[in-house]
Every structure is written in C-alpha cells, then in structure tokens.
Amino acid sequence: MGHGLHSADSATIGGGFAHGLGVAIGEDVKIGDGVTVGSFVVIEAGAHIADGCSIGNHVTICSGARLADGVHVADFAVIGRRPRLAASSTAKREELAGVRLGAGCSVGSHTVLMAGTTFGERCIVGDNAGVRERCTMGDGVVIGRSVTVENDTTIGSRTKIQSGAYITAYVTLEEDVFIAPMVVTTNDNFMGRTQERFKHLRGCTVRRGARVGGGAHLLPGIEIGAEAFIATGAVVTKDVPANTIVMGVPAKPVRPVPAEELLESAEG
C-alpha cells in the first residue's frame, strides 16, 4: 500500500488517501475518499473513517470507532478507548460500542474519548480533555481545554463547557447551557464511604439555557432551572428556580434574570 503503511488485506481505503510514516490499519477498517493520516497512527479493527477526515500524528483510532465526514483529530488523541475500571468503581461493566463522532467534529491534541459515547455534528473537544463512556452529546457542543466529562452524562445541543470544568457522572446538561471555567459538579454526598452511597449517587440537572459562573460548585442531585444564572464562586446546595440569579455560599436567590438576557430575547 505504500511506504510507511501496513494495512490488513480486509481493509478498504478510498481514493486520495494520504499518510505519513508508520501507519497501521487493522482488519475490516473502512476509510473514505480524501482522508489524510499523519505519522505513527494506529487504526484498529472495524473502525470506519468517512470522507474528508484528517488524522494527526501519533493518534489511535480504537476498534469499532465511527468518524463521519470531515472529522478532524489532532496529534496524540485516543478515540474510542475501552475503560479498565477499578474494583471499587461505580460505573457499569459491559461491552461498549465504538465511539461515534458526527460530521464536522474536531478533537484536540492529547484528548481521550472513551467507547460507548456519541457526539452529534460539529462538536468541538479541546486539547487535553477527557470524555468517559456512555455519554451523549448533541450537535454543536463545545468542550473546552482540560475539561473532564465523566461517564453516563448527557449534554444537549449548543451547550458550552469552558476550560478546566469538571462534569461528574450522571449529570444532565440540557440545550444552550453555559458552564464557565473551573466549575465543579458532584454526585456523592458520602464521598466514597459506605454501601449506602450507591443508592443515592446522582449528578445535577441543568435545564435549558442556564448559565453557571466560573468556579461555582453544584452539589449532588440538585436541579438548576431553565435560564437560571449561578454567580461566580457560588456553592449551590438546593434546587434553583427557573429565571433566577443566585449568589453566595451557600447560594441564595437575589433577583430574576433580566428579560433581555433570556434566550427568546437573545434569539429574537
């Protein structure tokens, strides 16, 4: 197949394929037209890479991964890694499908996306981010640099999570949510002690259009209402009503969100 390329006989490679040195392509891989692959890339068995994708250097595309048209993966990323769980982990143990990346997605350098997770179209995942297994992302989701998204999390379309935020397991972020840098979400009031914790493990729910300021902390199981505004550094211990600004430690309501800041006004 060419200098620097080792490809299994069962792999299918489209026209215009360009590659660097040391590329390994596994059994039953399918690569579309116009795909470019850097040096020292591994594409494991059963992965599908659609037309016009670009893969950087030292990338691993794990078995069963599906990359739709025009996906870009930067250097040193790992796409679709299977988890190896600790004995004490609360995450499910099951066979996972390959990761799915919708058309036009972009994945940053040194980012790890786990198997069983699905991204819609035009999502952006920044450098050094990590997204665990069984997560679901809508279209146009932005996950910033060094963000962690733990397992079994759902993120709605157009939601933005900025650098360094921590999204714990079992969280739901609806559409058009804004999460500022260094926000922390939690899901375990027992902090790892006693078997009782397994019955109460629950992440927060952030409803459509809510905004969470930098460094805020959201405690387990709380609900942030639609279009609510959480001030910088707030510690949210209780549910927050829709269209309400809360501040402080613990966070308390201070006033309604101004009408001109609501999504309907901004979109109108």
Located regions from the model:
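Structural signal for interior beta-strand "rungs" in well-ordered beta-sheet cores
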Residues: 5-8, 12-13, 17-247, 252-253
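C-terminal end-helix/capping segment
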Residues: 250-262
